[in-house]
Amino acid sequence: MQFNTDKPIQKSTEDLLGRKSFSKMLAEAVDKYKGTDSLVIGLFGKWGVGKTSIINMVLENLNDQIIVHFSPWNYSSHSDLINLFFIELSQSILDSGNARNKHTLKKAFLKYKRAIKVVSNKPIVKGMISALIQFVLGVHLEFLWSSPSLEETRDQLKKELGKINRKIIVVIDDIDRLTNEQIKDIFQLVKQVANFPNVIYLLSMDREIVCRALHEVQQ
């Protein structure tokens, strides 16, 4: 008797369902992207269809990029989520050994993190949640708020990130397994930091569950 687990595969040689061609094409598209503007890539599918396996094969086929795995499972507040994200993002970049501007980059991260936490602690209005739903549906939206302090620190961080000559791939998997509030927080976070240069977000989720969760949070 043979038992099969639902654990995702780790590399292309383990693929028995013909997903490696798609994974390779997606990886090539990321590698060939020469722009510095950030990208958000959504990988949609029901639970168990192999989204994590595809992500693993995509990462396997990427050429020398900085990979950031962000798992937003344990946090107590939105400001805590921001803190965890920037710790993970900054540490992954600094540990890669590719950032020659380590000192100024670390300083820029700290300043921006403090500024964005101040803004994020303001009450969330319903219009913003509606915008998050539109974001999931693929509608381009402008940044929903600004302040001089936030603008200044963001511009400095963008300048430092622009000096890195590799793409930064931020992977957030299983978004649909989070609570409704956590799902809202994740998309709010992505909207806040989605315009950084050289950063590509790969988001994996069940689109129907996520859209329903955001609608329910809006009520």
Regions found by a protein language model. Give the residues of each.
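Switch/connector loops and helix/strand junctions flanking conserved nucleotide-binding motifs
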Residues: 51-52, 77-80, 209-214
